[in-house]
A protein has these predicted regions:
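Conserved, charged catalytic cores of large soluble enzymes
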Residues: 17-57, 77, 81-98
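Basic, alpha-helical terminal appendages of large translation-related enzymes
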Residues: 59, 63-65, 74-175
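Short, surface-exposed loop/turn motifs that are enriched in glycine and acidic residues
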Residues: 3, 10, 39, 43-47, ...
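Extended, non-catalytic structural segments that build the interaction scaffolds
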Residues: 1-9, 52-71
Length: 175
C-alpha cells in the first residue's frame, strides 16, 4: 500500500503536476503559454488518447468498474509522463528557435493535467481541487467539471504552484 501511494500518487501524478508547474514558472513566468494551434505528432497522441480516455472512463463508471476507470486514468498519466521525457522541455527552453515548440509542450502538459484532474474528481475530490487551484483555475471552472474536451485550459492562466500534493510515506517494519 505504501509503495502504491508513493509510486502511483506521488511519483506518477504528483511529480507530473509539480514538474509541469515548475517549468511553466521557470520558462513562461508562471503563465500557461499560447500554443498557437500547433500540434506535433506526440501532441496529437495526447489529444487522441484523452478522447479515448473519456470513453473508457465513462464506460467503466457506467458499469461500476471503478478500478478499471482508475487503471485507464493511470495509463493516461503514464503517457503524459512519457511525453515529458520525449519532448524534453528543459532542452527546448535553451534555444530561442524552439520557443513555439516549448509553448506547445507546456500547454499540452497543463491541459493534460487539467483533464486528469477532472477524471480523478469522483475518486479524490480534495486532490482534484488542489490540482485545479495550482493550475490557476477558478472555482467556476472547477465545478464545471464536465469540460473534459481538449482545449479547455486557457492560455494566459497564471499557475499557482504550491507544495507537492502527495507526501512520500516511509514504511518501517518492526522486528
Amino acid at each position: 500500500m505504501v509503495n502504491r501511494i508513493n509510486c502511483d500518487l506521488g511519483n506518477d501524478l504528483g511529480n507530473l503536476l509539480h514538474r509541469t508547474l515548475t517549468m511553466i514558472e521557470k520558462y513562461c513566468d508562471g503563465i500557461v503559454p499560447d500554443h498557437e494551434g500547433l500540434l506535433s505528432t506526440e501532441g496529437e497522441e495526447l489529444v487522441g488518447r484523452s478522447k479515448k480516455l473519456n470513453d473508457q472512463v465513462d464506460h467503466a463508471m457506467s458499469n461500476l468498474q471503478f478500478s478499471k476507470a482508475l487503471e485507464s486514468i493511470w495509463d493516461y498519466i503514464g503517457l503524459v509522463n512519457k511525453y515529458v521525457e520525449i519532448s524534453k522541455p528543459w532542452v527546448l527552453a535553451k534555444e530561442l528557435s524552439t520557443k513555439n515548440k516549448l509553448n506547445e509542450v507546456l500547454y499540452n502538459l497543463a491541459e493534460s493535467i487539467r483533464i486528469i484532474s477532472l477524471f480523478i474528481l469522483p475518486f479524490m475530490p480534495n486532490v482534484a481541487a488542489e490540482m485545479h487551484k495550482q493550475l490557476g483555475l477558478s472555482p467556476d471552472e472547477e465545478s464545471a467539471g464536465n469540460n473534459i474536451t481538449w482545449g479547455g485550459m486557457r492560455p494566459g492562466t497564471k499557475v499557482c504552484k504550491g507544495t507537492p500534493i502527495f507526501r512520500k510515506f516511509e514504511y518501517s517494519a518492526e522486528n
